[in-house]
Amino acid sequence: MAEAYLLEKLKSVEQTYKELTRRLADPDIATNPDELQRVAKARSSLEETVNTYETWQKTKEEITGARQILKEAGGDSEMREMAALEVEELEEQLEQLENKLKVLLLPRDPNDDKNIMLEIRAGTGGDEASIWAGDLVRMYSRYAESQNWVVKLVSESLADMGGFKEAILEIKGDQVYSKLKFEAGVHRVQRVPVTEAGGRVHTSTATVAIMPEVDEVEVQIDPKDIEVSTARSGGAGGQNVNKVETAVDLFHKPTGIRIFCTEERSQLQNRERAMQILRAKLYEMKLREQQEAVSSMRRSQVGTGSRSEKIRTYNYKDNRVTDHRLGQNFSLVGALEGDIEVIIQSCIGKDQQERLAELANSPETAPVLN
């Protein structure tokens, strides 16, 4: 590798890791649980990079030793063959380790560790689009469960023929945003709808938005910009349903965003949930503007998360899911059951390749050490 800037960065990461390890051993930190958790999390985030760097250093030393044996083998053909084979194998290992280190050193998305609000809206296609939105709610719920994440439906607008006009899922767990951020965009389905008597294939769409959860400090909302009304809810609440107005209809005047929350048991809880969703929506709008600005400089094949970008087609007749960003096909049946990990990892890998290519073309990567 070893580009000079990468080696300097690795040494810096190693030094930070050692300092965090030293701090964890300090008895004083045990009296501050929040600080202990923060330091432990920071150290854990560097551990794979440091371990890989140590393996890379060890492999470099082994290559030097194997080359020395090859040099000293002289006329011993068997020894020369063994040493040459070892050098070849070690050089392959070294290349793999270098590629892994470059990926590990890519700048992390500050939102990657966050929980998300996943919004699904029925698009073109009438009743069938709403049914399709319901299928996507099920797909993402199944996938989240396979990742041991916690899923909760926090807002819904039911459609007459089944499914949803709109639904919002709250998904909590380990690195949720890092995996689901590439799911944002238009999901198109081609199939014979249950409402179609003639057996003709229809095309419908649903739009997915991925919104990192944010707190009040990250997104501040002026109370004067909010209009709130209440209504009787048909959600949880038993005999209170027809007596108490627990549902909350929140309207944000500057953006025109409207949120209707009925899933919680009290009006206060529904109001808090509506505000939480609004903060996530406003943050996602700001995030999209930033990503589109970056995208104008670097056209990402994986996509910017634009709501209007058609990212995937689900074809029932051919049992095929086509991801248009990857140019690859996957099994439809598996995907609809939530088995989309291979698609997600392919998107992550493509994004990493693009960012590595961009890094390689950057002027600051020019100096090289041997």
Curated annotation (Swiss-Prot):
Sequence positions bearing N5-methylglutamine: Q239
Localization per record: Cytoplasm
Keywords from the named record: Cytoplasm, Methylation, Protein biosynthesis
GO molecular function: translation release factor activity, codon specific
Highest taxon listed in the record's lineage: Bacteria
GO cellular component, one term: cytoplasm
Post-translational modification: Methylated by PrmC. Methylation increases the termination efficiency of RF1.
Alphabetized Pfam families for the sequence: PCRF (PF03462), RF-1 (PF00472)
PROSITE patterns listed in its UniProt record: RF_PROK_I (PS00745)
Family: Belongs to the prokaryotic/mitochondrial release factor family.
PANTHER family in alphabetical order: LD18447P, PEPTIDE CHAIN RELEASE FACTOR APG3, CHLOROPLASTIC
Biological function: Peptide chain release factor 1 directs the termination of translation in response to the peptide chain termination codons UAG and UAA.
The protein's name in its UniProt record: Peptide chain release factor 1
Lineage: Bacteria, Bacillati, Cyanobacteriota, Cyanophyceae, Oscillatoriophycideae
Name of the coding gene: prfA
